[in-house]
């Protein structure tokens, strides 16, 4: 490993999953103040006033951080849904909040629903502080069993050309819709449910939810992130992009996210799925992500994830990861949890060595992708699996390409913290010329 001081410092070790001494049942003991367990549907926000980072999650639980590496629980950020929401839904559940600041007002968009039904609504709560408390203002949209969609999982996006504000939302059934908001009130600016911009076929139960749209000023595209599959086992994160906030959103193969002809589960550019490095925790169902384009221009993706257990889904936890961009404008997600690392100039000598690599291949159902060994040699040859006729080269200070047969893999190379082996490392994150994402780390 390189001798240069390029690596992040050792982070605080993650708090262990709380369990009863006997084994399987989750403890009812209060969570450690730095625990990320039970964080679900995390929405990331960097407050320009306090300078602190916040995460808002299902259950109205809040987290706060100075650096996105160490987090502290701050308790409930809002109390109960408004009466008109409760009267419609019949529960006080608060799911999947998302936040936006308009003027001096912080606006939290919360979902009120019960699992597996369409009797749902999204309501707005407001505060003069990022940490709340948020006070309900009113219902934005609601659905019931007679509707073709489900009103949960809100995210707010602004049109960079005209300043109009939109709410993208939806879960299963009729897919993901986008609805214009009244920027003055934060409530709906139009009747109805808006426009469908993504959906899934009936064979997979229409399993799409957790939409999140961000705009990249460098590529001048809006990017729609959403989760496919089941939150309890095979969640995976897909991406499509559009020049217009209203779509159409097309994937890496120019397929529309509303296209129902997807028998092989390949529509949508997959940036994360269940994975396992050797000697590390096997993770499944990364999903319901949010994205942060920070004040310094850096990009991050935040999502919940579970430890592998296909028999009984355990509690979720939260991962924050650096996000980079390919040369043709697609997001690339770090294979390791964020520890404060920055991109630095690297040499070929830094990069030479033994690696584990993971190919994030779409499958039905979406399984856990397991790492395989790879070696990058000083003579610019490489090998992995049964492939020996492989070459590689650095194409920039922190970019690399790997070639074999008719395949070309493009990578970002960056320092990181190896959370499996608990040591500094280099990671590679990239995609091949077929649009399949790849992860790797140096041993």
Language model regions located:
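Carbohydrate-active catalytic/glycan-binding domains of CAZyme proteins
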Residues: 1-443
């Amino acid at each position: 490993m390189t001798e240069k001081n390029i690596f992040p410092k050792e982070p605080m070790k993650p708090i262990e999953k709380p369990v009863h001494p006997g084994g399987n049942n989750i403890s009812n003991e209060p969570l450690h103040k730095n625990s990320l367990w039970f964080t679900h549907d995390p929405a990331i926000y960097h407050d320009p006033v306090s300078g602190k980072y916040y995460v808002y999650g299902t259950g109205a639980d809040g987290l706060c951080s100075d650096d996105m590496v160490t987090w502290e629980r701050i308790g409930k950020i809002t109390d109960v849904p408004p009466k008109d929401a409760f009267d419609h839904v019949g529960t006080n559940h608060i799911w999947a909040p998302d936040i936006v600041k308009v003027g001096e007002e912080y606006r939290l968009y919360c979902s009120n629903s019960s699992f597996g039904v369409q009797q749902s609504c999204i309501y707005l709560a407001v505060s003069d502080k990022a940490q709340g408390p948020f006070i309900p203002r009113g219902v934005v949209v609601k659905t019931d069993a007679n509707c073709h969609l489900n009103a949960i999982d809100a995210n707010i996006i602004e049109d960079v050309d005209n300043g109009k504000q939109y709410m993208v939302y939806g879960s299963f059934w009729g897919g993901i819709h986008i609805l214009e908001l009244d920027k003055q009130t934060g409530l709906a600016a139009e009747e109805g449910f808006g426009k469908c911009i993504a959906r899934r076929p009936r064979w997979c139960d229409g399993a799409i939810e957790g939409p999140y749209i961000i705009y990249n000023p460098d590529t001048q595209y809006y990017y729609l992130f959403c989760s496919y599959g089941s939150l309890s086992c095979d969640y995976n994160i897909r991406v499509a992009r559009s020049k217009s906030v209203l779509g159409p959103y097309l994937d890496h193969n120019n397929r529309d996210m509303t296209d129902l002809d997807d028998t092989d589960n390949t529509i949508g550019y997959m940036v994360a799925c269940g994975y396992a490095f050797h000697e590390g925790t096997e993770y499944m169902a990364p999903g319901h992500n949010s994205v942060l384009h920070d004040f310094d221009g850096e990009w991050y993706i935040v999502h919940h994830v579970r430890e592998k257990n296909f028999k009984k889904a355990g509690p979720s936890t939260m991962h924050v990861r650096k996000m980079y961009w390919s040369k043709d404008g697609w997001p690339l997600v770090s294979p390791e949890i964020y520890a404060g690392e920055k991109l630095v100039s690297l040499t070929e000598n830094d990069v030479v060595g033994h690696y584990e690599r993971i190919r994030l291949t779409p499958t039905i159902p979406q399984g856990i992708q397991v790492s395989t060994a790879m070696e990058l040699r000083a003579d610019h040859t490489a090998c992995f699996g049964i492939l020996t006729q492989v070459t590689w080269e650095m194409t920039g200070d922190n970019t690399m390409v790997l070639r074999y047969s008719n395949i070309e893999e493009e990578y970002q190379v960056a320092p990181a913290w190896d959370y499996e082996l608990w040591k500094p490392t280099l990671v590679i994150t990239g995609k091949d010329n077929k649009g399949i994402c790849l992860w790797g780390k140096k041993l």
